[in-house]
UniProtKB/Swiss-Prot annotation:
Gene Ontology biological-process annotations: isopentenyl diphosphate biosynthetic process, methylerythritol 4-phosphate pathway; terpenoid biosynthetic process
SUPFAM superfamilies: Dihydropteroate synthetase-like, Nitrite and sulphite reductase 4Fe-4S domain-like
Keyword line: 4Fe-4S, Iron, Iron-sulfur, Isoprene biosynthesis, Metal-binding, Oxidoreductase
Record Pfam families: GcpE (PF04551)
Cofactor: [4Fe-4S] cluster
Family indicated by similarity: Belongs to the IspG family.
Gene3D superfamilies (UniProt xref): Dihydropteroate synthase-like, Sulfite Reductase Hemoprotein, domain 1
Protein's recorded name: 4-hydroxy-3-methylbut-2-en-1-yl diphosphate synthase (flavodoxin)
Organism of origin: Arthrobacter sp. (strain FB24)
Cofactor note: Binds 1 [4Fe-4S] cluster.
Protein's pathway: Isoprenoid biosynthesis; isopentenyl diphosphate biosynthesis via DXP pathway; isopentenyl diphosphate from 1-deoxy-D-xylulose 5-phosphate: step 5/6
Enzyme class per UniProt: oxidoreductase
Protein function: Converts 2C-methyl-D-erythritol 2,4-cyclodiphosphate (ME-2,4cPP) into 1-hydroxy-2-methyl-2-(E)-butenyl 4-diphosphate.
């Protein structure tokens, strides 16, 4: 069989816009800002007081590609759990603080990499910024000023009537000015809303007002399907213009699903190296094979692989050969058989019953070759299915 060169392209893939230039901060070992890759975050759903369960969920998130994790801290018992969690977590931990400013100081003392503060609901927050800034600077802790449409300050709500983009931005800029007034600059900002249109407008406005790193998020985005659409729409609009330095996809779903979606959004925009991608046609009356089943079986068979490989599963002769040729590995099916392509070359034709097995075997062979070339284990993670 002909040897075919595979792997990442020699030139970097194109992006829609250069990153907006921002100041650089650190969240533990992870850089956040225009000089660093865009990071993906999630938040644990376990009670923070259940240290073992929380650390287990953090381990699962880490394995799925999470860069930074946030944990809730609504009580003194939660604050007491933070030192162990921060010390044992494989990735930087952010403590999420509302209402009680004393927990901000507890989280900083506990060794959390960062603290998220909500100026809209922490009592007398503005009066304590000086002390928070000093403590954070002394411990090397960064801050996220997390403005949320659901918890704006009463004065701002009275001024604007509701959570408009202008209201969100005014709250964020005011709090940023207080930290900067006290010589503290290691913070990022979020201005979250559950409406992607308002959220996008707020971030665009905020991006014009300073060089702060921005944490993107659509708050209360909803169940998995709806939340994925909202987040992909909003993040795509902003990231394609260079706005955004770290993201959190909020879903009413297991946190690992948030990481899968976030990583896929970044990969789709060429903002993170592409990994295994399965391209499959949506099927139609021309299809001569069960494309749905083929795609599902190939996906299941390749679960656990994490390599820059595009696999095309096509069901007819219209787009099938072309898509299969464009992919690293693919099949164009019809008349009870499938033509197997590797980098545009037909390497064999197999009966329909052997398509899945053949694709998996070829993918494994390619993965092994790529792993040997890179000196790495290419079999880890899980593939992402994109239906075209």
């Amino acid at each position: 069989m002909t040897s075919v060169s595979l792997g990442m392209p020699s030139a970097p893939p194109p992006v829609l816009a250069p990153r907006r230039k921002t100041r650089q901060i650190k969240v533990g070992s992870v850089g956040v800002g225009s000089d660093s890759p865009i990071s993906v975050q999630s938040m644990t759903t376990t009670p923070t007081t259940d240290i073992n369960a929380t650390l287990q969920q953090i381990a699962e998130l880490t394995a799925s590609g999470c860069d930074i994790v946030r944990v809730a801290c609504p009580s003194a018992d939660d604050a007491e759990a933070l030192p162990i969690i921060a010390r044992k977590s494989q990735i930087p931990v952010i403590a999420d603080i509302h209402f009680q400013p004393k927990y901000v100081f507890a989280a900083i003392e506990a060794g959390c990499a960062a603290v998220r503060v909500n100026p809209g609901n922490i009592r007398k927050f503005d009066d304590q910024v000086k002390e928070i800034a000093r403590a954070a600077k002394d411990h090397g802790t960064s801050i996220r000023i997390g403005v949320n449409a659901g918890s704006l300050e009463p004065g701002i709500l009275k001024k604007y009537g509701k959570a408009t983009p202008e209201a969100l931005v005014e709250s964020a800029v005011w709090e940023a000015s207080l930290f900067e007034e006290h010589g503290f600059h290691d913070f990022k900002i979020s201005v979250k809303h559950n409406d992607p249109v308002i959220m996008v407008a707020a971030y665009e406005m905020l991006a014009e007002k300073g060089d702060w790193p921005l944490h993107l998020g659509v708050t209360e985005a909803g169940p998995a399907f709806q939340g994925t659409i909202k987040s992909a729409t909003a993040f795509g609009a902003l990231l394609s213009r260079g706005i955004g330095d770290t993201i959190r996809v909020s879903l009413s779903a297991p946190p690992v699903e948030e990481i899968k979606v976030g990583n896929q959004i970044l990969q789709s925009l060429n903002l993170r190296p592409r990994k295994l991608e399965i391209v499959s046609c949506p099927s139609c009356g021309r299809a001569q094979v069960d494309v749905y089943t083929l795609a599902e079986q190939v996906t299941a068979g390749l679960e656990g692989m994490e390599i820059p490989l595009r696999v095309a599963v096509m069901g007819c002769v219209v787009n099938g050969p072309g898509e299969a040729r464009e992919a690293d590995l693919g099949v164009a099916s019809g008349n009870g058989k499938g033509q197997i392509f590797v980098k545009g070359e037909v390497i064999k034709t197999v009966p329909e019953s052997e398509i899945v097995e053949t694709l998996i075997e070829e993918a494994m062979r390619i993965a092994e070759e790529m792993g040997e070339a890179d000196g790495e284990d290419a079999v880890k993670g899980s593939p992402v299915v994109s239906v075209s």
